[in-house]
């Protein structure tokens, strides 16, 4: 029987400062070979050019003025994620990638009439542990609209590179339940670029509306690593608090990485491939952070109100395979919850429902 290697030390310091390596052209080429599917939607939307026709994709419907002075670009359909990941890999190859912007792009991307495939929803529910119902989990709408955000994050001049970016937090607000049969209009933009001790952070906002009414909002916070002279001090792990008593344990197998990639369209090879993980310095693949959030939310599903906000901070990655411990405690009308390593109590995420 293969050893699980649960004692591999993947600390937050290592995640942000360590194994997320700078990609050389050789590493980028190796990762591009892992992405085997041919590109089918590899057209650019340029958020930095003053020319409205610059970088206009073939699936672009029209454009106008969005709020906060952003240029709003309407797409005819959701972009294909695979081509966007390949673009991100090519973007780190010297002489191929463009110059990074000094600020978030003044661009808002939108797509209307996104329908839910009931079989895909059922597949997602099974992978993440939700009940099979016609109501969309809060995290499913993130998956549904994420290709639009991915297009934004791979646009020329986006201030942080997608390759090697660290997803540090995600907040989802559900205004009302969304059911199968409803079509959703999405729009996305980036804001709040700010310095961080390890680089720069920004927020990518994704909003879902039905009939002109906002029903769902997701805010993902990403960290783009940048080299700092001398580096920062290592965190003192002795200050880590003891984990709370757990209410459930889950075995997270490598199949979770491949299954979630299939249902989410997020085929980042650090989640599905030993080679892809090693190219970024991880000894083996790690679980998608949004799978971890979805699995925790599924455990709370019977207790969720009609409208709520679920906020999560991602801590240490979940190596595949491993065993994790879930804990939850009521706080007023909501919940606090967490996911830790069942072996040594290292935190994987902390969250709240309010």
Language-model segment annotations:
Residues 271, 275-333, 339-344:
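Catalytic-pocket segment enriched in acidic/His residues
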Residues 111, 217, 307-309:
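Hydrophobic residues on conserved beta-strands that form the core of alpha/beta folds
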Residues 7-46, 51, 55:
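N-terminal intrinsically disordered, low-complexity tails
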Residues 62-95, 99-100, 148-150, 168-252, ...:
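HotDog/MaoC-like acyl-thioester-processing domains
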Residues 66-167, 229-303:
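Hot-dog-fold acyl-thioester-processing enzymes
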Residues 165-171, 306-310:
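Short, structured beta-strand/loop micro-motifs enriched in basic residues and often containing a Trp
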Residues 57, 61:
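Cationic, low-complexity basic patches in intrinsically disordered or flexible, solvent-exposed regions
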């Amino acid at each position: 029987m293969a050893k699980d290697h649960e004692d591999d030390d993947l600390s937050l310091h290592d995640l942000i400062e360590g194994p997320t390596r700078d990609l050389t052209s050789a590493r980028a080429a190796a990762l591009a070979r892992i992405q085997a599917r041919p590109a089918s939607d590899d057209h650019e939307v340029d958020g930095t050019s003053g020319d409205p026709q610059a970088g206009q994709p073939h699936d672009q419907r029209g454009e106008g003025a969005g709020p906060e002075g952003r240029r709003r670009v309407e797409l005819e359909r959701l972009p294909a994620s695979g081509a966007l990941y390949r673009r991100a890999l090519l973007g780190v190859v010297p002489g191929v990638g463009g110059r990074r912007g000094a600020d978030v792009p003044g661009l808002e991307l939108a797509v209307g009439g996104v329908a839910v495939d009931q079989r895909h929803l059922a597949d997602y529910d099974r992978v993440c542990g939700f009940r099979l119902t016609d109501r969309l989990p809060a995290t499913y709408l993130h998956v549904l609209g994420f290709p639009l955000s991915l297009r934004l994050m791979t646009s020329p001049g986006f201030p942080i590179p997608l390759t090697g970016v660290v997803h540090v937090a995600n907040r989802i607000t559900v205004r009302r339940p969304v059911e199968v049969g409803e079509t959703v209009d999405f729009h996305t933009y980036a804001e709040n670029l700010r310095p961080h001790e390890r680089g720069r952070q920004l927020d990518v906002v994704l909003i879902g509306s039905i009939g002109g009414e906002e029903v769902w909002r997701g805010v993902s916070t990403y960290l783009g690593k940048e080299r700092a002279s001398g580096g920062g001090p290592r965190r003192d792990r002795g200050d880590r608090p003891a984990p709370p008593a757990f209410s459930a344990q889950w075995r997270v197998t490598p199949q979770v990485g491949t299954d979630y990639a299939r249902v989410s369209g997020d085929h980042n090879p650090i989640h599905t491939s030993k080679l892809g993980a090693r190219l970024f310095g991880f000894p083996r693949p790690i679980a998608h952070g949004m799978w971890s959030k979805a699995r925790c939310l599924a455990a709370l599903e019977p207790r969720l109100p009609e409208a709520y906000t679920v906020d999560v901070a991602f801590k240490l990655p979940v190596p595949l395979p491993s065993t994790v411990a879930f804990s939850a405690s009521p706080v007023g009308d909501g919940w606090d919850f967490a996911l830790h390593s069942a072996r040594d109590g290292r935190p994987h995420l902390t969250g709240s429902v309010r």
